[in-house]
Amino acid sequence: MFDIGFWELVLISVIGLVVLGPERLPHAIRSVMHWITTAKNMANSVKTEVTQELKLHEINENMIKASKQGLSDLDPELQKSIDEMKETAEQLSRPYKKDIDDIKTSLDKNPSGTTQQENSILDSSKTTPPRQDKNE
């Protein structure tokens, strides 16, 4: 990573031994190794995030291009993801399909949008209530 050879490491070790002494040198080496490990992990994390963002950006651009060109000649990976989304949407709507079909058929039979029970309630509400005497 830093392109440091064997003799450079020996020189750094000797200088560290002279400056820090034999008691504090192992602790200093552990601290430096911990910092280096943390820096490597952070760099790998940033690298994976950038890779994911670039892939998302590429997919987004492909989707925009596909919507402009139509869905005829898509990238196979993009076509696969679109098919998966359609299948998921279909699976989510399956439990409600029977209810939707029932509602459509009832609306086709009764275009006003009210059921027979609602019609009977509406008809009964149209009758005038019995007249009450003022003396009571």
UniProtKB/Swiss-Prot annotation:
Keyword Transmembrane helix recorded: yes
Key word Coiled coil present: no
InterPro entries, A to Z: TatA/B/E, TatB
Annotated Polar residues bias: 108-130
A GO biological process held by the record: protein transport by the Tat complex
Molecular function terms, GO-annotated: protein transmembrane transporter activity
Pfam families: TatA_B_E (PF02416)
Entry keyword set: Cell inner membrane, Cell membrane, Membrane, Protein transport, Translocation, Transmembrane, Transmembrane helix, Transport
Subcellular location: Cell inner membrane
Membrane-crossing segments per the record: 1-21
Residue ranges with Basic and acidic residues bias: 77-89, 96-107
Assembly notes: The Tat system comprises two distinct complexes: a TatABC complex, containing multiple copies of TatA, TatB and TatC subunits, and a separate TatA complex, containing only TatA subunits. Substrates initially bind to the TatABC complex, which probably triggers association of the separate TatA complex to form the active translocon.
Membership in a protein family: Belongs to the TatB family.
Biological role stated in the UniProt entry: Part of the twin-arginine translocation (Tat) system that transports large folded proteins containing a characteristic twin-arginine motif in their signal peptide across membranes. Together with TatC, TatB is part of a receptor directly interacting with Tat signal peptides. TatB may form an oligomeric binding site that transiently accommodates folded Tat precursor proteins before their translocation.
Protein name as it appears in the record: Sec-independent protein translocase protein TatB
Gene responsible for this protein: tatB
